[in-house]
UniProtKB/Swiss-Prot annotation:
Catalysed conversion reaction: ATP + H2O + 4 H(+)(in) = ADP + phosphate + 5 H(+)(out)
Broad class of where this protein is predominantly found: plastid
List of residues binding ATP: G172, G173, A174, G175, V176, G177, K178, T179
InterPro entries recorded: AAA+_ATPase (IPR003593), ATP-synt_VA_C (IPR055190), ATP_synth_F1_bsu (IPR005722), ATPase_a/bsu_AS (IPR020003), ATPase_alpha/beta_chains (IPR050053), ATPase_F1/V1/A1_a/bsu_N (IPR004100), ATPase_F1/V1/A1_a/bsu_N_sf (IPR036121), ATPase_F1/V1/A1_a/bsu_nucl-bd (IPR000194)
Keyword set, alphabetical order: ATP synthesis, ATP-binding, CF(1), Chloroplast, Hydrogen ion transport, Ion transport, Membrane, Nucleotide-binding, Plastid, Thylakoid, Translocase, Transport
Organism: Triticum aestivum (Wheat)
Family: Belongs to the ATPase alpha/beta chains family.
Gene Ontology CC annotation, any one: proton-transporting ATP synthase complex
Subcellular location: Plastid, Chloroplast thylakoid membrane
Protein name: ATP synthase subunit beta, chloroplastic
UniProt-listed Pfam families: ATP-synt_ab (PF00006), ATP-synt_ab_N (PF02874), ATP-synt_VA_C (PF22919)
GO BP: any one term: proton motive force-driven mitochondrial ATP synthesis
Catalytic EC class: translocase
GO molecular function annotations of the record: ATP binding; ATP hydrolysis activity; proton-transporting ATP synthase activity, rotational mechanism
Gene: atpB
């Protein structure tokens, strides 16, 4: 007899142990269920309602236990619409938390919060399943070595490097290249690190999820001909889903990523778009459960909920999960509790700039606004650190001079400032790069640039050795040797035109 139910054990129970209850009350996505004495389910257990509505349509609703109300009653939150449910319907306690399929069979497929495929490609051929509620890795399992996660993208690796097993915040409005940057990272981790990616669409637009899927198929990140060779699994809980689904879809994606890290011992990229929607869904559920709201109307358990997700994203001795999280900042207020709680967990920020995108510089990563805790001499080495600082100083000086240039023109600047501007413009263009996933749109072959090559290139620009080359030669190239080759080509083209 279970008299003191708390959080359930990870293993599923046998059919004999499954107890049944009855729906007592339905308020929107929240159900109150009464069970026989001593048969109460554990907190976080999955409950299933299988019945028929008044039109004789099949109902199949999964819920998650959130509260114990006393008098043999529990309060659960539905993971799908509660249309057609009625008081008195039978509810089955599955005896375990929600479990989702994991492993190689998930690659190239789209799942919902319950781990059910929603891409009309048939069932998933995976015998392995993991519960979505799992403990964070123990301290003894964590990899304490600070190491850089090389992405092959110059601006990221030089100025705001990612930490292996770290968490990165991605800030950017619509149409500045967030999706293309995400797809390039998925492509590069597969090629350079032999890793895979999991994309968690949390509370965002269904259209965007569909566009991402179509673009991934077009760029080859999802291989339609041989689905197992795809590099990414997609988990969607979009804006139209009930708050329970939006609150748990991040955990479903994370659970799939944990399998690749812990069992396959791979480096995994986990994308969460958008982490703010995870908090927002938690706030909605908290209100539905009758909890007293905290600051700005958010749930009182905000920090705990965020921590339980973020602490599972870590680098262990087996493999790593590096997470890139799109962060929506409500009303651009960085002190709002949702983004403020997220910032406490981030190791780096990648800020996309509309100004750079309008100049045609892609990736449109803002070199001055993007930051990383990894950019320290003891971690990246003196050469990398000093090069990055000099690049930032040059770009900052150029930014300060732009007002003067706009009013008086370049001719009014001192010789030293004119040289700084010329080098800054070369640096700005050299920070652009052709992407593999954009080949189908641009016709330019993609480039993966190793960190050592990136540092060498910027050192040559800063030293003045390349002052004679036109700035156009640095635009959309890989390493610095390609810029020199492009300069010769441009010169020959100019001669032939004359």
């Amino acid at each position: 007899m279970r008299t003191n139910p708390t959080t359930s054990p990870p293993g599923a129970s046998t059919i004999e142990e499954k107890s049944t209850g009855r729906i007592d009350q339905i308020i929107g996505p929240v159900l109150d269920v009464t069970f026989p004495p001593g048969k109460l389910p554990y907190i976080y257990n999955a409950l299933v309602v299988q019945s028929r509505d008044t039109d004789d349509k099949q109902i199949n609703v999964t819920c998650e236990v959130q509260q114990l109300l006393g008098n043999n009653r529990v309060r659960a939150v539905a993971m799908s619409a509660t249309d057609g449910l009625m008081r008195g319907m039978e509810v089955i306690d599955t005896g375990a938390p929600l479990s989702v399929p994991v492993g190689g069979a998930t690659l190239g497929r789209i799942f919902n919060v319950l781990g059910e495929p929603v891409d009309n490609l048939g069932p998933v051929d995976s015998s392995a399943t993991f519960p979505i509620h799992r403990s964070a890795p123990a301290f003894i399992e964590l990899d304490t070595k600070l190491s850089i996660f090389e992405t092959g993208i110059k601006v990221v690796d030089l100025l705001a490097p990612y930490r292996r097993g770290g968490k990165i915040g991605l800030f950017g409005g619509a149409g500045v290249g967030k999706t293309v940057l995400i797809m390039e990272l998925i492509n590069n981790i597969a090629k350079a690190h032999g890793g895979v990616s999991v994309f968690g669409g949390v509370g965002e637009r269904t259209r965007e999820g569909n566009d991402l899927y179509m673009e991934m198929k077009e760029s080859g990140v999802i291989n339609e001909k041989n689905i197992e060779e795809s590099k990414v699994a997609l988990v969607y809980g979009q804006m139209n889903e009930p708050p329970g689904a939006r609150m748990r879809v991040g955990l479903t994606a994370l659970t799939m990523a944990e399998y690749f890290r812990d069992v396959n011992k791979q480096d995994v990229l986990l994308f969460i778009d958008n982490i703010f929607r995870f908090v927002q869904a938690g706030s909605e559920v908290s209100a539905l459960l009758g909890r007293m709201p905290s600051a700005v109307g958010y749930q009182p358990t905000l920090s705990t909920e965020m921590g339980s997700l973020q602490e599972r994203i870590a680098s262990t001795k087996k493999g790593s999960i590096t997470s890139i999280q799109a962060v929506y900042v409500p009303a651009d207020d960085l002190t709002d509790p949702a983004p403020a709680t997220t910032f406490a967990h981030l190791d780096a920020t990648t800020v996309l700039s509309r100004g750079l995108a309008s100049k045609g510089i892609y990736p449109a990563v803002d070199p001055l606004d993007s930051t990383s805790t990894m950019l320290q001499p003891r971690i990246v080495g003196n050469e990398h650190y000093e090069t990055a600082q000099r690049v930032k100083e040059t770009l900052q000086r150029y930014k300060e001079l732009q007002d003067i240039i706009a009013i008086l023109g370049l001719d009014e600047l001192s010789e030293e400032d004119r040289l700084t501007v010329a080098r800054a413009r070369k640096i700005e263009r050299f920070l652009s790069q052709p992407f593999f996933v954009a080949e189908v749109f641009t016709g330019s072959p993609g480039k993966y640039v190793a960190l050592a090559e990136t540092i060498r290139g910027f050192q040559l620009i800063l030293s003045g050795e390349l002052d004679g080359l036109p700035e156009q030669a640095f635009y959309l190239v890989g390493n610095i040797d390609e810029a020199s080759t492009k300069a010769i080509t441009l010169e020959e083209e100019n001669k032939s035109q004359k």
